[in-house]
Amino acid sequence: MNKVLAEIIAGVIPHKMTRNRWRGILRYGLFNAIRLKREIKRNHTEPKFRLAVCAIAKNEGPYFKEWIEWHLAHGVDQFFIYDNESNDGTREILEPYIERGVVDYKYWPGYRMQLAAYDDCLEHHRFDSRWIAFSDLDEFIVPVKDATIPDFLNRFEAFPAVEINWLVYGSGGNKEKSNEDVMKRFRFHSLPDHYLNRHVKSIVNPRRVFTMIGCHEVARIDGKAADSHGNPITRNFRERTPQQDVIRINHYAVRSLEEFREKQLRGRASGTKTSVPMDYFNEYDLNDIEEKQ
């Protein structure tokens, strides 16, 4: 469906969460939605992967090893990586993981390609993955109460998606880039209830969703998404108190000042052509609490 028409139709729905869901369904297309529901009823393939992560990245090569190894150690089976015109050796850095069969790599050029990558991931991996997390290279999923992320997900079999809150980490005063791991370098984070931590990322059951709505929420086929405490979600994430006591996403949005300036130069895989403003650094450089060792 035409994007403008979809926005007009969705705009008349008063409840924000319902409106967002229908925005996603209309973007996916009503005929596609009907076709998908029929296909899901017929397809009983046993998923190959318990948990996969889908990410699109542009010139994030130096960060991949730590990010992949962290998530492998915490229960991720597979990574679907979409490379948005990287020229920093990303493909070569990922090669050992591609050879192991841990990374499924796609070169994904173009402008504003994040949602297109997520759509492609769902269409190609809907039946081979039990859960898919949609995340970025500056985000680390951290199970707090469980040993692994799948251990956490075992309590959510009845839900089509789980929304997990951020915990934003600042620069800690670091001006220059370093080869040390991100999670070791940046130990200072925001206050847990800071408004930025209301943002979420979703882990979805791909057989029960149509498509992503932006990078945070998903258009569900049925049922309600859950928060990390296992409660059905009835309010938009911007209206909810952040939860980080069971599981959280460490969000290293700025890293050091030098790395942020590199981020300004490369732009975002989500598609904006304008440079990331310095105001973003000032907003996300939150260093209120030092993480316990």
Where are the regions that the model predicts?
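Catalytic-site signature of metal-activated, phosphate-bearing donor transferases
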Residues: N2-R35, A116, P143-Q293
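Conserved donor nucleotide-binding strand/loop of the catalytic core
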Residues: E95-M113, P192, L196-K201
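Active-site nucleotide-sugar/metal-binding loop of Leloir-type enzymes
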Residues: D119-W131
